[in-house]
């Protein structure tokens, strides 16, 4: 594909030299990239009588289906000149696959890890359970195996859905997940509690999310599908750089135009990958995904709008404007939009968020408020190592309540790094970045968490 054709696909219909140069500038100077091409694979056909046989079937299925994924993505990168940062796989929630098996589900986690490494992908997600209305024997067994599974593998990611707007919040699962997070941290204490960076606790999880660590291949999905997650915070920041004095509705209009171009890129890459791999094209996830590099920050976009630093009063409103404009621009560019589709605010993966935590401009309470707007929730936040399991469960319950009451996906991915106190810094390496340890509320909540049971669904969740 020639660069003028690529430029036209982004919305530069005049195919002018300006459009071509603008495209090149977005890629080279403003870090426009495809954050992930994720292949979703159904493993329902892999269930066998024993865990060992199931693990073998899972390995064979993943390696055969994804054999050409990395090769195809690298070919598209060379052809278009646009980086595809990650190639990933999501699979059917493993608690469903192992429901009829005797044995230890960690065997399947290790098979997934080996399969992912053998085909060359960065991560594989789906060591997951869906327990918003209660857990089966298989669900409970998998949840209790998560600390070992994530601490003894390198690229396997896990998630648990504990709530939905139709079912309410499963507080028994919330209580359990606080303990699981603490155990996972303890088992990887010599590696900055890295297992916790691969574990997400959801409300209203979705089965077509291409982003890690919360990706899994939903049971409503086909046998195999390829989806795309875009990036491009730098492109949006650049678009707003010339708007000094503009009104906020003008700012929103400019964000929509930038989101259109970013999403068009994702749709083009997804369509090419789908055709070359011979599998259906799933969705483009519109989420703006930052990195810890300078010029690739969602927080910086909010500051370009006029905030002296993210975290001050007005931050949630600025994030609402950004999130809505990204969705509107992206939906005009692609008819197959899905996943989480909004703005990610992971602390360790966003230079602006890291700086705000360092200076005390943003607190965990403000981060919680922002999650009422953004795609995910309390994401990649390092907290003190002595934080009790009940406090973590309280964070999960609060996030689930926001998601359930607002019919949106929310999640918690916090990392209680053993031996750390507020102000320490933790380096997770690579795309996961680094983060200052943020203070948390130390007032107790254990009686509330230990009550268990369910928080009922809201009345507006009953829509039939």
Curated annotation (Swiss-Prot):
Pfam families: DUF711
Domain of life assignment: Bacteria
InterPro entries linked to this entry: UPF0210
HAMAP family: UPF0210 (MF_01221)
Family under the similarity heading: Belongs to the UPF0210 family.
Quaternary organization: Homodimer.
Protein name: UPF0210 protein Cgl1545/cg1743
Organism: Corynebacterium glutamicum (strain ATCC 13032 / DSM 20300 / JCM 1318 / BCRC 11384 / CCUG 27702 / LMG 3730 / NBRC 12168 / NCIMB 10025 / NRRL B-2784 / 534)
């Amino acid at each position: 594909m020639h660069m003028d054709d690529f430029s036209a696909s982004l919305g530069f219909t005049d195919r002018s030299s300006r459009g071509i140069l603008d495209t090149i500038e977005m890629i080279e100077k403003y870090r426009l990239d495809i954050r992930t091409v994720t292949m979703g694979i159904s493993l329902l056909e892999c269930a066998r009588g024993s865990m060992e046989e199931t693990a073998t079937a899972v390995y064979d299925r993943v390696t055969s289906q994804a054999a050409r994924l990395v090769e195809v993505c690298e070919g598209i990168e060379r052809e278009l000149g646009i980086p595809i940062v990650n190639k990933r796989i999501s699979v059917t929630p493993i608690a469903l696959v192992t429901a009829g098996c005797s044995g230890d589900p960690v065997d399947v986690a290790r098979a997934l890890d080996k399969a992912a490494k053998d085909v060359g992908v960065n991560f594989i997600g789906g060591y997951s359970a869906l327990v918003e209305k209660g857990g089966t024997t298989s669900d409970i067994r998998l949840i209790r195996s998560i600390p070992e599974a994530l601490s003894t593998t390198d690229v396997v990611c896990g998630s648990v859905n504990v709530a939905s707007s139709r079912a309410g919040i499963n507080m028994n699962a919330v209580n359990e997940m606080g303990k699981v997070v603490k155990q996972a941290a303890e088992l990887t204490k010599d590696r900055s509690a890295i297992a916790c960076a691969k574990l997400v606790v959801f409300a209203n999880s979705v089965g077509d999310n291409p982003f890690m660590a919360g990706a899994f291949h939903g049971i409503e999905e086909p046998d195999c599908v390829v989806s795309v997650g875009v990036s491009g915070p730098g492109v949006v920041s650049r678009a707003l750089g010339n708007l000094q004095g503009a009104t906020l509705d003008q700012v929103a209009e400019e964000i929509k135009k930038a989101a259109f171009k970013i999403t068009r890129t994702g749709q083009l890459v997804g369509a090419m990958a789908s055709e070359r791999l011979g599998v259906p094209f799933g969705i483009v996830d519109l989420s703006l995904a930052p990195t810890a590099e300078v010029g690739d920050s969602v927080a910086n976009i909010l500051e370009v709008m006029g905030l002296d630093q993210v975290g001050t009063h007005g931050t949630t409103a600025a994030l609402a404007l950004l999130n809505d404009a990204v969705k509107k621009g992206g939906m005009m560019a692609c008819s197959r939009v899905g996943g989480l589709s909004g703005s990610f605010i992971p602390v360790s993966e966003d230079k602006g968020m890291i700086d705000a935590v360092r200076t005390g401009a943003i607190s965990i309470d403000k981060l919680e408020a922002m999650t009422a707007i953004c795609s995910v929730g309390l994401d990649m936040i390092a907290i003190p190592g002595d934080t009790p399991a009940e406090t973590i469960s309280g964070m999960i319950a609060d996030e689930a309540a926001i998601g359930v009451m607002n019919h949106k996906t929310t999640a918690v991915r916090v990392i209680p790094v053993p031996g750390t106190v507020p102000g320490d810094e933790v380096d997770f390496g690579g795309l996961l970045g680094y983060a200052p340890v943020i203070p948390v509320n130390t007032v107790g909540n254990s009686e509330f968490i230990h009550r268990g049971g369910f928080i009922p669904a809201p009345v507006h969740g009953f829509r039939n």
